[in-house]
C-alpha cells in the first residue's frame, strides 16, 4: 500500500449495481466503464460492499461475471460483517482466485434485509456481535498471507474510543488505514499519524458537491448551501497531508475524473 502513496496512485470509489435496480444492463455497463477507466489509468478501483445498507451486487462477483481484467494492486474490495458465513467465503475465494489482494475490512452499514455474521461463524468467543476486529482475525486465520487488509478510522468519534479500536484492529492483522471523509485539516487525524508513523494512511476526500450528504459521516449538520469546491479541497488535502494517499469518494467520472491527473503533483 505504501507503493500507492509513493507513486501517487489514487483510490477511486466505485459502487456496484444495486440488486433492486430496474436497469441492470445499463448499470453493469456503467460499472464496467468506470472500472476500466480506473484500471487503464493505473489507479486503484475501490468497490463498496452494500454501501449505506443497500443490497448491491458484490464487487468480486461483478468483476468475475463481466470478465474484467484484474491487476493485483489496482483493486480493493470492501468487505463488511453483513454476510452469511457461506457468502463470506464465496467472496474471499473469488478474490483469491482473481488475484485481488487488497481488502478494506469494516463493520459496515446494516439493515433488516441483510444477514449478519454471528460470533460462532468466525470462531469468536466472549463477544456479542462480530465487528471488523473479529472479521480481520478470522480472515487472517483462514487465509494466511493471502490478503493485505486495511481498516477504517473515524476522526468524528470520541478519540479515546477510536484509538482503542484501532489498536485492536492492528492486533487482529490490519496493515493500513483509510479515514472517513474530511474537507479540511483534522486534529484527530494528525494525532493518529503521530501514533502510527510507519503505517500507510489513506485520507478519504469527499468529491460530491452535495456537501449536506456528508453530515451523515461527520455526525453534525452541514448546511446544503455551504460553499464547497471538491477539487480545490482535494488539492488542499494534498498540501495538508503530503505523505498520505487519497481515496476519492463519490467522484464525478464525467466532470471530475479528467481533472485529477493535475491534482496530485
Which residue ranges define each predicted feature?
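Acidic (Asp/Glu)-rich catalytic clusters
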Residues: 2-6, 32-40, 60-72, 92-100, ...
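Active-site mouth loops of central-metabolism enzymes
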Residues: 8-29, 74-86, 148-161, 217-228
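Hydrophobic faces of well-ordered beta-strands that scaffold small-molecule active sites
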Residues: 8-16, 43-47, 75-79, 103-105, ...
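C-terminal extensions of enzymes
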Residues: 8-10, 235-265
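Catalytic domains of carbohydrate-active enzymes, especially glycoside hydrolases
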Residues: 30-48, 169-178
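Active-site-adjacent beta->alpha loops and helix N-cap segments on the catalytic face
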Residues: 53-66, 83-90, 109-139, 159-161, ...
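Conserved anion-binding
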Residues: 102-163, 167, 172, 197-213
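Catalytic-face loop-and-helix region of soluble metabolic enzyme cores
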Residues: 198-245
Amino acid at each position: 500500500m505504501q507503493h500507492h502513496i509513493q507513486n501517487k496512485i489514487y483510490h477511486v470509489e466505485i459502487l456496484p449495481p444495486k440488486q433492486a435496480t430496474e436497469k441492470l444492463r445499463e448499470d453493469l455497463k456503467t460499472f464496467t466503464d468506470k472500472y476500466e477507466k480506473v484500471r487503464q489509468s493505473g489507479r486503484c478501483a475501490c468497490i463498496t460492499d452494500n454501501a449505506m445498507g443497500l443490497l448491491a451486487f458484490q464487487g468480486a462477483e461483478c468483476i468475475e461475471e463481466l470478465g474484467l481484467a484484474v491487476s493485483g494492486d489496482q483493486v480493493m474490495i470492501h468487505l463488511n460483517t453483513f454476510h452469511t458465513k457461506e457468502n463470506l467465503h464465496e467472496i474471499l475465494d473469488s478474490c483469491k482466485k482473481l488475484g485481488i489482494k487488497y481488502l478494506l475490512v469494516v463493520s459496515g452499514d446494516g439493515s433488516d434485509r441483510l444477514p449478519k455474521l454471528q460470533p460462532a461463524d468466525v470462531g469468536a468467543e466472549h463477544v456479542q456481535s462480530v465487528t471488523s476486529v473479529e472479521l480481520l482475525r478470522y480472515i487472517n486465520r483462514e487465509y494466511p498471507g493471502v490478503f493485505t487488509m486495511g481498516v477504517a478510522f473515524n476522526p468524528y468519534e470520541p478519540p479515546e474510543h477510536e484509538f482503542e479500536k484501532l489498536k485492536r484492529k492492528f492486533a487482529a492483522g490490519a496493515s493500513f488505514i483509510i479515514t472517513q471523509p474530511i474537507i479540511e485539516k483534522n486534529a484527530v487525524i494528525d494525532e493518529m499519524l503521530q501514533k502510527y508513523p510507519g503505517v500507510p494512511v489513506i485520507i478519504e476526500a469527499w468529491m460530491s458537491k452535495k456537501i449536506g450528504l456528508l453530515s451523515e459521516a461527520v455526525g453534525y449538520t452541514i448546511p446544503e448551501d455551504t460553499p464547497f469546491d471538491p477539487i480545490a479541497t482535494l488539492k488542499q488535502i494534498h498540501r495538508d497531508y503530503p505523505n498520505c494517499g487519497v481515496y476519492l469518494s463519490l467522484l464525478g467520472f464525467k466532470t471530475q475524473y479528467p481533472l485529477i491527473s493535475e491534482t496530485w503533483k
